[in-house]
C-alpha cells in the first residue's frame, strides 16, 4: 500500500531516518544553547531598561540594537554570512555541525526578545515589594521575575522551538542536512513530490508535538 502511495520515500527509508536524526541533533544542540543565552540576554534587557532594577542605558541600548539587527537578517542570508564563524568554532561550515552556529545566531535574538516581553508582564508591585524587603537584584531576578514568569516563558520557549524547527529545515537548503536537505535533494531536485509531502507531514507532526507540550507547560 505505502509502496504505491509514496514509492520514492519507501526506497529511501534509511536516508529519511538519518535526516530526522540530523534534524533532532540540530534542534537539540542549538535549542539548548539558545535557551540559555536567550534567557540570559532577556533578563539583561529587562533589568537594564529604563526604570529597571539595574538600569543601565548604554548596556540596554547596545544589546537592543544588536538584537534588532540580527533579527532583521533573513536566515537564508545569515547562514553563508556566518560561515567563517562555523569554520572557526565547529571546524566545518557544512553538515549538522556547520548549522549549529547560524541556528544559534538566528534563534537567540528572537528568544531574547520573547523573554523580555514575558518578564515585562510581571506585576511591578511584586518587584517593589521585593526591593522594600531588601532583596538583591539577583534575588529579585530569580524569586520574582523568573518565578512569576514561568507560564509566559514556557509559551515563549514553545514559539521559539517551533520557529527553530523551520530554521533547521531552511538550513538544509544550504547543505546542513536534516529534513530540509532531504526534501530539496530528493523531492525537489529529482522531482519526487511524495518525498516533499512526507517531509512536510513529519515537520507538521514535530510542530504539533511541540505545541502540545508547550500548552501543557504554560498552564498556570
What are these regions (language model features)?
Residues 44-50, 132, 196-220:
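C-terminal transmembrane helix and the adjacent membrane-cytosol boundary/short C-terminal tail
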Residues 44-82, 103, 108, 114-117:
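Cytoplasmic-entry segments and transmembrane alpha-helices of multi-pass inner-membrane transporters
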Residues 16-47, 157:
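Transmembrane alpha-helix signature in integral membrane proteins
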Residues 18, 22-26, 71, 75-110, ...:
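Loop-to-helix entry region at the N-terminal start of transmembrane alpha-helices
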Residues 167-197, 201-202:
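Glycine-rich helix-loop "coupling/hinge" segments at transmembrane-helix boundaries
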Residues 1-31, 56-61:
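Periplasmic/extracellular loop-to-transmembrane helix junction in inner-membrane transport proteins
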Residues 137-168:
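Transmembrane alpha-helices
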Residues 119-149, 189:
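Short helix-to-coil transition segments within interhelical loops
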Amino acid at each position: 500500500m505505502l509502496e504505491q502511495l509514496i514509492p520514492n520515500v519507501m526506497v529511501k527509508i534509511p536516508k529519511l531516518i538519518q535526516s530526522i536524526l540530523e534534524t533532532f541533533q540540530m534542534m537539540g544542540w542549538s535549542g539548548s544553547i539558545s535557551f540559555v543565552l536567550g534567557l540570559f540576554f532577556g533578563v539583561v534587557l529587562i533589568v537594564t531598561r529604563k526604570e529597571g532594577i539595574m538600569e543601565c542605558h548604554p548596556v540596554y541600548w547596545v544589546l537592543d540594537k544588536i538584537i534588532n539587527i540580527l533579527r532583521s537578517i533573513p536566515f537564508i542570508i545569515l547562514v553563508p554570512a556566518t560561515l567563517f564563524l562555523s569554520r572557526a568554532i565547529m571546524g566545518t561550515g557544512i553538515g549538522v555541525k556547520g548549522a549549529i552556529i547560524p541556528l544559534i545566531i538566528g534563534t537567540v535574538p528572537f528568544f531574547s526578545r520573547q523573554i523580555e516581553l514575558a518578564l515585562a508582564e510581571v506585576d511591578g508591585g511584586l518587584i517593589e515589594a521585593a526591593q522594600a524587603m531588601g532583596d538583591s537584584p539577583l534575588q529579585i531576578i530569580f524569586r520574582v521575575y523568573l518565578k512569576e514568569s514561568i507560564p509566559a516563558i514556557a509559551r515563549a520557549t514553545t514559539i521559539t522551538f517551533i520557529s527553530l524547527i523551520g530554521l533547521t529545515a531552511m538550513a538544509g537548503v544550504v547543505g546542513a542536512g536534516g529534513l530540509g536537505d532531504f526534501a530539496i535533494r530528493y523531492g525537489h531536485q529529482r522531482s519526487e513530490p511524495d518525498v516533499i509531502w512526507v517531509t512536510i507531514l513529519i515537520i507538521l507532526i514535530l510542530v504539533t508535538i511541540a505545541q502540545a507540550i508547550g500548552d501543557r507547560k504554560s498552564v498556570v
